[in-house]
């Protein structure tokens, strides 16, 4: 690639420059810290970026051989950062079409060169872009530099520890043709209001990826089962991505979750791959909530070796034939246009792919991608008041849009609840029978005609009445290796007693430990001694 003429808004970083050469031109640098200093970047404004062009080479934030321990510069910092960058609008552009040629690196992690989860960068500003470069933390992984093998560096430790890349408070972040390399807690520039990763490569283990972002034409190397800690907000969207599951060929079926603690995931036109004899079960999360719905369309798996989500769980919504699909893609005349403009355009019409005009002309903007209820659990009491259930539809960038929500009840006691429509986005739930004498639970499902779905539990409680009178004191009798509690009521009653058994070393029960509890409407009258 041709090197640009440097000026205050176009800086050049080249590690091969001699100090004398750098001193002759105020806009050329040979040190990554200096080119990202406040003084070097002060020409940037929100409307006009400073672009840093980076020649092929490895740019270390710290000496990779140093044994110094990095700590938090400020107690308020989330992590010990290698470098804090202040720039209203910053572009980092590698001067090679191969992102492996331009490497910004460190090799520190938690308890290995740092106290805490070492993170290369924190970027302050409104907008951040990266292109044609690798951002890597080589604490737990070797840096193999093909352009000059003599510059390759072995990992600092064999331990897989938290070794992070970067975060930002920017509103907009766009990475194109970049590589993000680490293992545990990859953290590939997280925190922006809107994030797009385009044609990027990721290597990581757990708790690693940005959980609120759009990934387009990206490749992922999964070395463990939970690459996202939580898909926060409106979640993560993967468009035309490939997931390489790097599990051993050991005959075991490996669980490939997307998240550790849940959140919405959307897969469009994506595929999974693994070694020839690797078996993988793909799931969204280990313990999905009743509200969780993840969406997919045209996702392919190696036949016979991968178990897809629609078989493995009930939280998957296929949107291939639904109107909701237009929130993510438009298919016309054999061509697919990914609707990133709908997902990330926001109030300021951000258009990182440059196809916003086509999307607007087609009328496929402001399409919601998430349906939420006020809670994941509601309570109804026999003889009590009705409850008002409200839902809302959100665009991917979090703006609420009007939509018509349809509600239905599912479960063994569904017929005992009446649904009254209040408005296009809410309903009233009322028990038909006020004489219900046991606790039960049903599922409330909410959905839109476009294809959005969510759910919640509705717990039904019997009417509270005064406790019945006992004919005498309760008695516990030993029957072999069983203790039996006996009691009678003065009048015939449906026994809903809540019996709890404790174990204690003394009669004062100061150190009591719960050993058995009753289930709803099933008093635990017998306790087995062990």
Model-predicted segments: where are they?
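Short, exposed coil/turn segments at beta-strand boundaries within extracellular/luminal domains
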Residues: 399, 447-457, 530
């Amino acid at each position: 690639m041709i090197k640009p003429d440097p000026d205050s808004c176009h800086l050049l970083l080249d590690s091969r420059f001699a100090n004398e050469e750098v001193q002759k031109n105020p806009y050329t640098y040979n040190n990554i810290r200096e080119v990202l200093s406040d003084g070097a970047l002060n020409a940037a404004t929100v409307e006009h970026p400073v672009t840093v062009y980076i020649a092929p080479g490895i740019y270390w934030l710290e000496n990779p051989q140093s044994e110094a321990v990095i700590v938090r510069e400020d107690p308020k910092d989330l992590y010990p950062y290698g470098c804090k960058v202040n720039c209203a609008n910053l572009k980092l552009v590698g001067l090679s079409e191969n992102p492996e040629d331009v490497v910004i690196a460190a090799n520190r992690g938690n308890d290995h060169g740092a106290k805490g989860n070492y993170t290369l960068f924190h970027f302050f500003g409104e907008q951040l872009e990266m292109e044609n470069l690798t951002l890597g933390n080589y604490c737990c992984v070797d840096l193999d530099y093909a352009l000059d093998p003599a510059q390759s560096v072995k990992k600092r430790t064999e331990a897989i520890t938290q070794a992070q890349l970067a975060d930002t408070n920017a509103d907009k972040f766009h990475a194109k043709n970049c590589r993000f390399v680490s293992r545990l807690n990859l953290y590939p520039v997280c925190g922006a209001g809107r994030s797009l990763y385009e044609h990027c490569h990721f290597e990581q283990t757990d708790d690693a990826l940005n959980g609120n972002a759009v990934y387009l034409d990206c490749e992922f190397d999964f070395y463990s089962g939970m690459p996202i800690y939580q898909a926060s907000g409106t979640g993560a969207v993967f468009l035309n991505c490939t997931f390489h599951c790097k599990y051993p060929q050991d005959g075991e079926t490996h669980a490939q979750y997307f998240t550790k603690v849940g959140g919405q995931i959307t897969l469009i036109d994506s595929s999974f791959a693994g070694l020839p004899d690797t078996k993988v079960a793909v799931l969204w999360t280990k313990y999905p909530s009743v509200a969780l719905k993840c969406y997919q369309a045209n996702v392919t798996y190696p036949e016979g070796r991968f178990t897809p989500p629609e078989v493995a769980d009930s939280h998957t919504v296929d949107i291939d034939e639904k109107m909701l699909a237009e929130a993510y893609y438009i298919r016309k005349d054999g061509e697919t246009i990914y609707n990133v403009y709908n997902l990330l355009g926001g109030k300021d019409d951000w258009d990182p792919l440059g196809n916003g005009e086509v999307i607007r002309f087609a009328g496929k903007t402001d399409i919601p991608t998430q349906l939420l209820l006020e809670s994941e659990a509601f309570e109804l009491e026999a003889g009590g008041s009705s409850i008002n259930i409200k839902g809302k539809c959100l665009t991917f960038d979090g703006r609420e849009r009007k939509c018509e929500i349809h509600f239905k009840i599912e479960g063994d006691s569904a017929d005992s609840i009446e649904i009254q429509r209040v408005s296009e986005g809410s309903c009233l739930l009322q028990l038909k029978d006020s004489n219900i004498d046991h606790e039960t639970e049903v599922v409330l499902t909410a959905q839109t005609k476009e294809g959005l779905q969510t759910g919640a539990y509705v717990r039904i409680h019997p009417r509270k009445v005064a406790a019945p009178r006992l004919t005498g004191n309760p008695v516990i009798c030993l029957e072999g290796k069983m203790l039996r509690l006996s009691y009678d009521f003065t009048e015939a009653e449906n026994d809903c007693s809540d019996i709890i058994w404790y174990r204690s070393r003394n009669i004062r029960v100061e150190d009591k430990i719960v050993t058995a509890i009753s289930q709803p409407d099933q008093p635990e009258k017998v306790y087995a001694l062990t």
